[in-house]
Amino acid sequence: MGIRRKRPFAGAVVFTAFLFWVPFQAFPAVQDSKDSAPVDRLNKTYFKKFGQDFGSVIASPGRWGTSDFLKFTALAGTGVLLYGFDQEIYDWVQKQKTPSSINASPYISKFGQGGYLTALAVAMYASGEIFDSPGLRKTALLSLESFLTTTAVVLTFKAVAGRARPNTGESAHSFHPFSFTSGYTSFPSGDAAGAFSVATVIAEQTPEVFVDILAYGLAGLVAIYRVHDRKHWPSDVFTGSALGFFVGKKISRLNKNSSSGNSHVSFELTPHRQSITLSLYF
């Protein structure tokens, strides 16, 4: 069996090209009109809107303005800087492992897995049907849309980049484009992207700060643990997280006017003399 050659230059090109596509999916030129049908039911309207939104996400870079390119420069610079120090940061994270962090891994990692994220969306939608909540249904459907859109893009770039995972023993600059093997699907991180794609939609649909903190906090832990568990390099999780965040933002913005009634999910903590009540409003 021959030894694959490392392609640091090719890897850098693929990495930069991907970063050029990722940022500012949250700033689309196309938005729903106020008369759009509400996207809070799993029906033909939803699937039609899903297709339109997917096309808008893919075409986003063609609508960038000057401010978008300036913001891209900042994000790309951060990503390239991480790429240059991937090995050093990865080694440092490995040295910080403790028995507690290792034991927590199986639980935290679940929040980035596609099966669990899909199950979360299904559970939210079912709850929306049971409680007749357009807000919960819409949050569920947009979460699913954001996750599936993000996943489609992630899988494409994984195949094109073919970056070696840390656990293969190869360097942080080892790329094998179109190898289609699990050991060469490190860039970008699908779990980090999926976690942030859903967390962002949930945060956008709820006005409560503590929900934002919880959603983004869990997504952040998922990203960190992908490096902790030797599955990804730091630049993989940074790019995946950025992708999930901006796709989630854009999906939310594209559907911000397609609502019926109260489309937000609201929480309220009420202290009492001998108890605390958590109220959920749809």
Indicate residue ranges for each PLM-predicted region.
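Long, hydrophobic/aromatic-enriched structural stretches that serve as scaffold segments
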Residues: A121-M124
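Alpha-helical transmembrane segments
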Residues: F72-A76
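A short, ordered amphipathic alpha-helix with a cationic face
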Residues: N43-F47, G79, D91-V93
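Alpha-helical transmembrane segments of multi-pass membrane proteins
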Residues: G79-Q87
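Interfacial/capping segments of alpha-helical transmembrane domains
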Residues: D86-K97
